[in-house]
Amino acid sequence: ATLTAISYWHLSVSRAGYPNVLIPPVECLAAYYLLTGYRAGSRWRMALGGAFIGLVLWTYLAARLWPVTVALWALYTLIIEPRHTLSRWQGWVLAVLACLAVFAPLGAHFYLHPEDFLERAGQVLVFTQTPPAQIPALLGRNLLATLGGLVVQGDPRTTFNLPGRPTFMLWMAPFLFWGLARALRHWRRTELVLLPIWLLGMCLPAILTDDAMPQSQRMSGIMPAVFALVALGLDEAWRLLERCQPALKRWLPTGLVALLLIFDGAVAARDYFGVWARRSDVYIDEHGPYELVASRAVQELEAGRVPVVIAQHYKHPTSAYLLPRSLDAVWSVGDKTLPLPNRGGAEVIYLWPYNDSPLRQELRDRLFAMAQEEEPLHSPWGDEMVRVFRLAPDVLAAEAELSAHAAFGNELAVLDWSLDRTMPRTKPLRLLLHWRALAHPDAGRVLSLHIYDEQGLRWMEKTSLGYIPEQWQPGDTVYQLYELELPRGIPAGRYQARLLMSREGGLGAFPVVVAGEMTGSYVDLGWFTLTPEGGSIEAPHEASYEEMLPGVLRLIEHKAPPVSAHQGDTITTELLWQALATPEGDVDITLALLDANGRETWAQSYPLTPGYPTSQWQPQEVVQGRYALSLRDAPAGPYQLVLHVGAATRPLGEILIDAVERSFEEPPMDAAVDVLFGSEILLLGYSLPAAPYRAGDVLPLTLHWQAQVQPASDHKVFVHLVDATGAIVAQRDAAPVDWTRPTSGWLADEVVSDPQYLTLPSHLPAGEYQLLVGLYDAETLQRLSSAAGDDGRLALATVQVE
């Protein structure tokens, strides 16, 4: 117990706040009651020991090996003293039942939620993280590093240790080996042999993981055993001294052992409180800078200034706990955001714990250009921890004068952006966006950057919004950096950057407004070119597929088609190619559907990579191709999707195309309209019962459309209910037939009956209202023109609300 209490390891674990500190005491209770019950033949003691075995499983993942360790010891006792062990069978049974009873609630949870049991283990176990051929060597290295962590080189991580400090210093290490030798020498005393079994068994959680070694937090279960072994070694030394110096036996052994323990404890205290605790990296890891931030933020708030905290976490819990008022500061999250809050012209002070949240270079440059650095904040030991900047007085005024390029509704204005127009494929795509808040949002918002190719296929997207919407105030401006890793094998060519904003959850995209007019659902940030330089050059892949063009081109991966789709859908497939040599000419491919009889019923041809001809590929370059397949003309049924390249054919997967019920006859309807929208879609009429309605009712409106030609793009239907002043009191926007029949899948002359049920607000006053309908382009948001109205809205009917 003394060895444990004075050890650096136990001191560190007990103060770190991790649940693994609970493993050793619960293990000790389990071992004590199991051993004493086994020796005395006490069934209730063995049952209590089993209960503590079940309890330890509630503490930490590494504790899962404790029942295994106990089982190995029980097997050893059965081998060494079979009669005695079998005579205690009732106690063993009770121990197992008690263990299962205590573990049962947690076991039931794991049964219902197996991911909670497997996920973390799957992230670290060598069997899931390491190629099979490398596992034996890795386990050997882990074993040596784990055992070496006791006496040679300890855990390298400051969170769990003074980096490199072994569990036992040079003067204590010999007693560990001495105690281990004593336990093994008395191999028939099962209570002593439990200690080496315990040591090895509870080292397994560390040995079996693929991580930095040694892993002190995963081997905390060995504490009772390893300190008991050292105690055995000290006891042996004590006895030896008594035999060698019998005349001094009353004080010499006791005095020497006491001095050794005092010295070891003093060194541990010095290492922990005097060395480890004063390290700047420990101060940062333990969130010390946020104590400084909280104090300074409150000072600035009381002085009427606006503190901006640049942090890794929103409203950092350390600051919140110490000084709750620090939460009133402006918090910028992550290293890719720099807000300029405008609070009536109040001075802005930036508090930047730069070691914890290092701003990206583009934002550093902006901060240094716009603000003057002041005296930093220091740790209690004098280390610089938080940099402080004061925003120049004229910056906010200059920001307010900037004109907007576009706006998302009435909430966010895009001021400008910077994006390299030509870049190699060797580095991430970086875009610096400058925007202004126009309003305080009522909920969360998502601002995302999408990258499309010239065929309209999306290749990348990134969401970045370190300035949380609940902090937005009108006039705030923000510099926001987007950094996108390029996909493996992305072809050279031209790409378009699009900026979109939606409500949290990705629903409800905001319209883009330019000069008071809606222009679409995204802000076009322009086109850029990825040059051929920096392609993915890889060693030749083993031929999991045969070469599609012998000696020239190999398909190395493909994305299977969806299991099912509907007629009229567009699906995307991805193929990953490798050039074995530069093709002499440009290669085309064909994707086809084969029916159950192997007959080709549908096919489309494509350039292998439209914007990056194969004649420009480099030898061994890996290039990804993406292909959009329109199923508008594909017949329904089960098919196999196949790839044709020259004379070579490769199946890509099976797909079931579900039939869409199509009609070319006009259905019965309450009123005929015959109004053409655009040049493609005719509204034949509608069905709507004429009975009066009440607030909260649903209008059972059905619109009947007819395609005059095959529509070239997707359109959405809008239904507006307006009052006498023209104000919209209820509306619905959706693709036809509740999003299941996109207009791009319609055939010429096809008739589509489209239910567009509109819910009336519960507080809607009685009176007459007008029902307006129309179509708009799903991408540009532009309404299709109609002969019935200049604004693209057709007055359909009058609705009476009682």
Question: Where would I find each of the regions flagged by the language model?
Answer:
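Short, solvent-exposed loop/linker segments at the N-terminal edge
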Residues: 421-426, 563-568, 691-696
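Short, surface-exposed loop/turn segments at beta-strand-coil junctions that are enriched for proline
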Residues: 438, 484-492, 580, 628-636, ...
